[in-house]
């Protein structure tokens, strides 16, 4: 699933293609369940709306429209967005497309049909924002904020990092990578981290996410940016999906366990679980 770096990369690549464009109308929809509100209402509300900003909140891509509306798009497992010529919408896994006033289309290709497109008013946007924790790359996300988020929590730190209500945008890939960089075992109860460990984890989260954005995200399967380009960060993984391979720090074989129903990779020497 695209995480913060991938969605941020998509937003940055779509912005120059979409800013100031007007949505002419709904061009294609063959999977109505992906839309909120229902298709007839959705189509009527987006027609003629001007795209004023392209941004991100957590793992949601946000297209700010005039008249107080926002298109909130979640790519889920296999979705990707492109601005392309109209014929591109005929591809077999394109389930949603919007006509733009420059003759092109914003198309949503989603092989597994898990993606979602929500048209939100100001109240809906506030609710989406409130459902997520702080953005980890903002100045407001400090070690003290991280410590407060983890206070008294006995769940494994890996599971807590995946909880979007606590911290926004971190998914399985970057939780694994940040914990390795910080030298913290993924099963460590979040509320037991020391001040030094919290500082190390805070630094690691920000560094890993920033590096991933600089490399246009990670392309393991379907992920592409708004121009159809693959990311490169998968070439820089230290532990993710590297079971049995040597740890870049100490050469110990990387191990795999399951935490919060997700594959979890760590170095048993660099990331010791303190009982």
UniProtKB/Swiss-Prot annotation:
Q: Which NCBIfam families match?
A: fpg (TIGR00577), PRK01103.1 (NF002211)
Q: Which family does it belong to?
A: Belongs to the FPG family.
What are the residue ranges of zinc fingers typed FPG-type?
A: 238-272
The protein's name in its UniProt record: Formamidopyrimidine-DNA glycosylase
* Keywords tagged on the record: DNA damage, DNA repair, DNA-binding, Glycosidase, Hydrolase, Lyase, Metal-binding, Multifunctional enzyme, Zinc, Zinc-finger
Q: Does the keyword Acyltransferase apply?
A: no
- List the catalytic residues: 2 (schiff-base intermediate with dna), 3 (proton donor), 59 (proton donor), 262 (proton donor)
Enzyme Commission number, as recorded: 3.2.2.23, 4.2.99.18
How, per the record, is the cofactor bound?
Binds 1 zinc ion per subunit.
Top-level taxon of the source organism = Bacteria
Query: Transmembrane helix: is it a keyword of this entry?
Result: no
Q: Which reaction does it catalyse?
A: Hydrolysis of DNA containing ring-opened 7-methylguanine residues, releasing 2,6-diamino-4-hydroxy-5-(N-methyl)formamidopyrimidine; 2'-deoxyribonucleotide-(2'-deoxyribose 5'-phosphate)-2'-deoxyribonucleotide-DNA = a 3'-end 2'-deoxyribonucleotide-(2,3-dehydro-2,3-deoxyribose 5'-phosphate)-DNA + a 5'-end 5'-phospho-2'-deoxyribonucleoside-DNA + H(+)
What GO molecular function terms would the record report?
8-oxo-7,8-dihydroguanine DNA N-glycosylase activity; class I DNA-(apurinic or apyrimidinic site) endonuclease activity; damaged DNA binding; zinc ion binding
Quaternary structure (record): Monomer.
Binding site residues for DNA: 93, 112, 153
**Gene3D superfamilies, from UniProt?**
1.10.8.50, MutM-like, N-terminal
The function of this protein is: Involved in base excision repair of DNA damaged by oxidation or by mutagenic agents. Acts as a DNA glycosylase that recognizes and removes damaged bases. Has a preference for oxidized purines, such as 7,8-dihydro-8-oxoguanine (8-oxoG). Has AP (apurinic/apyrimidinic) lyase activity and introduces nicks in the DNA strand. Cleaves the DNA backbone by beta-delta elimination to generate a single-strand break at the site of the removed base with both 3'- and 5'-phosphates.
Q: Which residues form the signal peptide?
A: none
Q: Which GO biological process categories is it annotated with?
A: base-excision repair
- What cofactors does the UniProt entry give for this protein? Zn(2+)
């Amino acid at each position: 699933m695209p995480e913060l770096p991938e969605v941020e990369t998509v937003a940055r690549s779509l912005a120059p293609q979409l800013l100031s464009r007007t949505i002419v109308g709904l061009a294609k929809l063959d999977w109505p369940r992906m839309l909120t509100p229902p298709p007839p209402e959705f189509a009527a509300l987006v027609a003629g709306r001007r795209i004023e900003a392209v941004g991100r909140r957590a793992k949601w891509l946000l297209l700010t429209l005039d008249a107080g509306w926002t298109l909130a798009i979640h790519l889920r497992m296999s979705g990707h967005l492109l601005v392309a010529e109209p014929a591109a919408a005929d591809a077999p896994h394109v389930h949603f497309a919007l006509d733009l006033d420059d003759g092109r289309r914003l198309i949503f290709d989603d092989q597994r049909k898990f993606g979602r497109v929500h048209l939100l008013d100001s109240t809906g946007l506030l609710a989406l924002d409130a459902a997520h924790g702080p953005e980890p790359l903002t100045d407001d996300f400090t070690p003290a904020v991280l410590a407060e988020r983890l206070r008294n929590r006995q769940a494994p730190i890996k599971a807590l990092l995946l909880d979007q209500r606590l911290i926004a945008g971190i998914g399985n890939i970057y939780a694994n990578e940040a914990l390795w960089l910080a030298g913290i075992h993924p099963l460590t109860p979040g509320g037991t981290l020391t001040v030094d460990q919290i500082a190390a984890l805070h630094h690691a989260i920000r560094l890993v996410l920033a590096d991933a954005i600089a490399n246009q995200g990670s392309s393991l399967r379907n992920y592409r940016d708004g121009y159809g380009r693959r990311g490169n960060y998968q070439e820089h993984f230290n532990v993710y999906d590297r079971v049995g391979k040597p740890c870049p720090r100490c050469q110990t074989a990387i191990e795999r366990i399951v935490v919060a129903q997700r594959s979890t990779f760590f170095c048993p020497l660099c990331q010791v679980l303190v009982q």
